[in-house]
């Protein structure tokens, strides 16, 4: 299983099937907590559809900022949801996961991605650095 954790969207692909998931990188939680709504299922499209239609006690969190994890616990919940959703056909099988990470992230940030994926139910996690956008860091 390959995962591209994006600031806006997360893509998941499976060997032989291609991209099987393309959902917003957003999680709906009870305001002031990290409690993910709907038993941990208020993630991706479900969370995005809740925006603007829910009481003020619910907030949407984008757990990645500038390509890195800004909220470890929420990223773990998001990864867990996406892995469960894609792997649902084979719940007893823990997938090997390859995750694309920005080339400039620190060792601490890499460890956070690894731990999030491991806790989300992956058997083995591999990180692959993605090339940096050449426009990144250019002054305007």
Summary of predicted features, one role per range:
Residues 1-140:
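Nucleotide/phosphate-binding catalytic cleft detector across ATP-hydrolyzing
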